[in-house]
């Protein structure tokens, strides 16, 4: 593993010494705070997300879950009570309120495709249940019994009926086409909205018929933000485009493309979009990794290679494609490993500043500055585009310029920008309140040309008046 201190050398972020007078846009940047308890989410909103301009935060499923130790128990509901090892209903409500007060919307991870996979048990908050019997919520007739495979589990992803009516990994599959099930799901989601939630990530949306989700979402208040988890699979019948009418989509193809940085290659987003690998930008949630891809080996991660992961995140924030989602979580050595917990099994506070097993991307200075750069330039046209296998560069109107070097060797060359002539400074060396540049200054000529020495695996972002 590369030393995380290399990030300060690898990511060179620059800004004009003169102030920026451009009209500011509202940030579109979000973050997944995976397994942060409610108190920690509120703290991060107040101390880092709000001040940095992060627009929304995705939090882990808030409902009561199976009472076991692994992280994935949160994705096995046993009731719709807002009570989990991440915190109580009152703590959840307080968290949402505190985040909203500093301009951060809360998106809740909604597990509505299924309930648990356990034969029976008692949930975290004391609710007794059986696999197909959840008192006051669901009975056996509220679940699919597909009869299409052994044990009613999905074995053929090319078969739409199996994907959407059989059991995912043995989890009891709700009959989301029935009126009773839809009403109870809507009641749960409306309960969360009453606590201030702005929208939902629909977990395992691929396993719910698009028409079922249309009916559920239509019953929610207008303006509820929706993002679907639908992984594209070659040769599969169910495809992400079916879900575009009801919300945005997590674009897993973007995450896979970001692994190009691992082989010293800058992803060509324009080419990938033209070849049909991506959904339209306005509907895409772009990300480098999430809680699943972090564990299945299909993405860059903050633990496996922090320098490359951070470089890809900077690239994501600089690009025009999608609505970017950052990622923060905890370190682990085993797939099933839960976050740090207390004596009663409750998830402990995430103390980012102490580096006690938590990866807190939202507190990195380069990420904070890149959010600001994106917010100021996001509505400007992209010009002066250059792309080779190892580097890319582009301008954003007459205000911004970005260049990135994915190679493990230095790149020295001139770039054409649309920036005004001026002196620019390495903002990674700033703590936020310096009046002068503490590092090397960069000159942009009268013709807009800048000579840059891009360090190995580094990025440069310039901002003008």
PLM regions: where:
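Alpha-helical scaffold elements lining the catalytic groove of polysaccharide deacetylases
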Residues: 176-188
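Bacterial N-terminal signal peptides that target proteins for export
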Residues: 1-10
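Active-site-proximal helices and loops of the catalytic beta/alpha 8
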Residues: 26-31, 44-50, 54-55, 61-77, ...
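Active-site cleft segment of glycoside hydrolase catalytic domains centered on the general acid/base Glu
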Residues: 166-179, 209-217, 221
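Boundary/entry segment of secreted carbohydrate-active catalytic domains
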Residues: 23-40, 168-173, 177-178
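Aromatic- and acidic-residue-enriched carbohydrate-binding clefts of CAZyme catalytic domains
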Residues: 28, 65-97, 133-175
